[in-house]
Amino acid sequence: MKSFNELVGKLSDPASRQALKSMQRGIEREALRIEKSGHLALDKHPKALGSALTHSRITTDYSESLLEFITPVFADIDELVEDLTLTHAYSVRHLNGQRLWPVSMPCYLGDGADIPIADYGSSNSGQMKSLYRKGLTYRYGAQMQIISGVHFNFSVSDKLWHRLYELSDKSLSLDDFISDSYFGLIRNYRRLVWVLPYLFGASPALCSTFIQDPKTSNFPFEVIGDGTLFMPYATSLRMSDLGYTNQEQDNLNISYNSLTDYLTGMQAAINMPSANFAKIGVKVDGEYRQLNDNILQIENEFYSPIRAKRVAKGSEKPSESLARAGVEYIEVRALDVNPYSAVGIEKSQIRFLDLFLLNCLLQPSAPSDATEEAEIAENLQAVVLEGRKPGLLLKRSGQELSLTHWLESLFGNLKQIAQLLDDEGQDDYQVALAKWHKAVENPNETLSGKIMAGLKDEQVDHSEWVMELAEQYHQQLKAYPLTENVDKRYQQDAVESLEKQAYLESQPSVSFDQFLVDYFKV
């Protein structure tokens, strides 16, 4: 494979630069509904937002209280953020006085018993979605499931694939080359995944209510104000063992070395029984507790900071879609909600992600082994827990390397890509890169650094600060202009989604027991 510098040189002609620029992106942003008191909203998904089962833009994640806003695919960043903003603006007008929680970590009082699991109605597919979430509750507790994040979907253009294929040795078919290259991107992303919590991690602190007993926690928390726990150099507690973790999955060792390896590993994981989860029971006294007692109930339960994806046809499982036609796009899952944006992510982050992911694609990407996977996990944990610590050392190929030195080297590569993406008289990518470059030498310029500086300077509780932001963004989004046509379109989408759910529920169907048997047939 050609070196990074060789590839960048080959892509510097006008046609190649245009192909490079034609990226497609989509965003999924999760946000809890909260009452004005700051407590979690416990009511049903608002009817004005349509059916969470069938609406294409507004749904729920784990809980009835956890909204998820989904954009279509856009090639233009301004249009992407505008669409996300309009969906937020419409939604906040229909929350009956509730607000959206603008950070990843919830401030929740309780044992999780009252957190309402998302309800998708009485159709078999709706019941299955709810039961999957019930299984997550039994397995990991409800509290972990109401942590929110932002997912970034990304693909490059067919034109770029044809250009890169021309520059390859053509030992694979074009389709196989595309999947192989996406897996190369994924491996490089995993090697560098720590960069995202370093820059964009926004959960260095949380409400003490999230930890049942801070004194018995393994984390060396310090306290600000009345009830805010923090770690001095943490970047993303959401990405730590406090957040999304699953020790059962630690031994799955699913390989990203090829699509075939990945699908083989996923198939094995789906069918691997768990002694721990068997103790819960699948159907107890006539009532389901989980879909099955395997390590993964379904593929979606597999936690990874990046996923290979393809749009499913009909009732295809994710791996069936990939097996049918290969990788279509990737989903970045390592982003905290950005509290400095009303919609959880800002344009400079999107431009950085474009550069970061293109770098992961264009760099050579050797297969990964168990030793490197251990390094990857170690580096990520080091950065989420103490990424802003002066002189922090990470590991690369068995050698220690300072985080700052590694970042400087990376930013040098990103600058070359930014120069290809910016047209004459336009410097959006270079400006975004310069903005985040400030955080390389000065950790206070990271999102987590800014948050901690603000909490310490003002000596406010995390929850108080977040409530102020929630109110500010509520007013901002409520005032955001919605034309009559746009408002009508959202109303129509809501009505049509409810009709679609009602239609699904009116159709003759097999029993739910039989539906599950059919779904899990190998």
Curated annotation (Swiss-Prot):
InterPro entries membership: Gln_synth/guanido_kin_cat_dom, Glu_cys_ligase, Glut_cys_ligase
ATP-binding keyword on record: yes
Cellular component, GO annotation: cytosol
One GO BP annotation of this record: glutathione biosynthetic process
Pathway where it operates: Sulfur metabolism; glutathione biosynthesis; glutathione from L-cysteine and L-glutamate: step 1/2
Pfam families linked to this entry: Glu_cys_ligase (PF04262)
Keywords per UniProt: ATP-binding, Glutathione biosynthesis, Ligase, Nucleotide-binding
Encoding gene (name): gshA
Enzyme Commission number(s) of this protein: 6.3.2.2
Protein name, per record: Glutamate--cysteine ligase
Upper taxonomic lineage: Bacteria, Pseudomonadati, Pseudomonadota, Gammaproteobacteria, Alteromonadales
Family recorded in the similarity comment: Belongs to the glutamate--cysteine ligase type 1 family. Type 1 subfamily.
Gene Ontology terms for molecular function: ATP binding; glutamate-cysteine ligase activity; metal ion binding
Enzymatic reactions: L-cysteine + L-glutamate + ATP = gamma-L-glutamyl-L-cysteine + ADP + phosphate + H(+)
